[in-house]
């Protein structure tokens, strides 16, 4: 059995005197026998509730798992107008700080067990930034659905930084549509399910995403500025230089995931780490799976691989 509790955790804001708060859910085994913790960072235009089944499974295996909604997402957003908008001043640093604050909460609550980090998609880039900032908090990291350098990302960051000062809350349907269209290029011969084909092979998962009012909300200019900022920092050639070379990392992705350039991005990331002397890097591409490998038809295989990797590193 799993005990599940939800609440809000307050953070100090980057803007002096301003506080932020995150909606989180903690999953833990009812018997109290906890062998490790896991902090999960979700992706863009979704929310932590989509990881409930995965978190419950891990809690049944003896982990204390915490999921939470980033700024501008899920129940952390104060209202629907806040969805897709983070904050005007240094939003990328704020989301990384929020993640560290959640990690600190989990670490203090379960101080005598190993702590692990998992980030998916945008959450994978936030996770990589968090490892730069506070890698010593963790005993290992699972990077899901990540990518390498994106051509034009630095230019996009510069342009969006300027637009963030002019019209941060503006939601460009063109930019949002372009983003989805690029991700769907490989699948253009399939019947288009409102631009969600790239997310997964599982059509039920696509429909669940489309029917979830907290998913797929148009990102604001500020949202894309935040996304590009964490992406550029996370994909720097020496992004992991603050981590010890023995730090264990598991990189997993679908072979048909456009965010990882269909395996090329994750392979390059792992190759760079190995060239830099990292000794405990594991990579697995799941044949035929797309972006959301935690929500695919064969997701149980992914779940099993993750728990086996964690148990190997206890």
What are these regions (language model features)?
Residues 109-121:
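Alpha/beta-hydrolase fold nucleophile elbow
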Residues 127-214:
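Alpha/beta-hydrolase-fold enzymes
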Residues 276-314:
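Catalytic active-site module of serine/aspartate enzymes centered on a nucleophile-bearing elbow/loop
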Residues 42-46, 121-122, 255-256:
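Active-site glycine-rich loops that stabilize anionic/oxyanionic intermediates
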Residues 87-107:
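Alpha/beta-hydrolase active-site loop
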Residues 34-43:
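Short beta-strand element of the alpha/beta-hydrolase
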Residues 251-253:
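Short beta-strand/loop motif that positions the catalytic acidic residue
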Residues 50, 55-81:
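Conserved alpha/beta-hydrolase
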């Amino acid at each position: 059995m799993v005990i599940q509790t939800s609440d809000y955790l307050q953070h100090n804001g980057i803007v002096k005197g301003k506080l932020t708060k995150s909606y989180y859910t903690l999953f833990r085994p009812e018997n109290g026998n906890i062998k490790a913790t896991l902090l999960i960072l979700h992706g863009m235009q979704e929310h932590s509730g989509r990881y409930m089944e995965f978190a419950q499974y891990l809690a049944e295996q003896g982990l204390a798992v915490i999921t939470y909604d980033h700024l501008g997402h899920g129940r952390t957003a104060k209202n629907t107008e806040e969805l897709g908008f983070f904050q005007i001043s240094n939003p990328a640093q704020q989301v990384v700080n929020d993640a560290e604050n959640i990690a600190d909460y989990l670490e203090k609550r379960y101080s005598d067990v190993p702590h692990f980090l998992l980030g998916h998609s945008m959450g994978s880039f936030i996770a990589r930034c968090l490892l730069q900032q506070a890698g010593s908090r963790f005993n290992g990291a699972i990077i899901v659905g990540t990518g390498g350098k994106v051509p034009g990302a630095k230019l996009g960051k510069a342009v969006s930084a300027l637009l963030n000062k002019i019209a941060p809350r503006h939601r460009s349907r063109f930019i949002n549509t372009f983003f989805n269209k690029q991700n769907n290029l490989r699948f253009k011969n399939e019947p288009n399910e409102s631009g969600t084909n790239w997310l997964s092979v599982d059509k039920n998962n696509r429909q669940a995403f489309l029917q979830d009012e907290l998913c797929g909300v148009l990102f604001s200019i500020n949202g894309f500025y935040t996304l590009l900022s964490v992406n550029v920092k996370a994909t720097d050639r020496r992004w992991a230089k603050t981590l010890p070379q023995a730090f264990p990392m598991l990189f997993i992705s679908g072979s048909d995931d456009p965010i990882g350039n269909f395996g090329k991005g994750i392979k390059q990331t792992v190759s760079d780490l190995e060239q830099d002397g990292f000794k405990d890097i594991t990579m697995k591409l799941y044949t035929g799976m797309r972006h959301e490998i935690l929500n695919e038809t064969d997701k149980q295989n992914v779940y099993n691989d993750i728990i086996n990797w964690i148990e190997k590193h206890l």
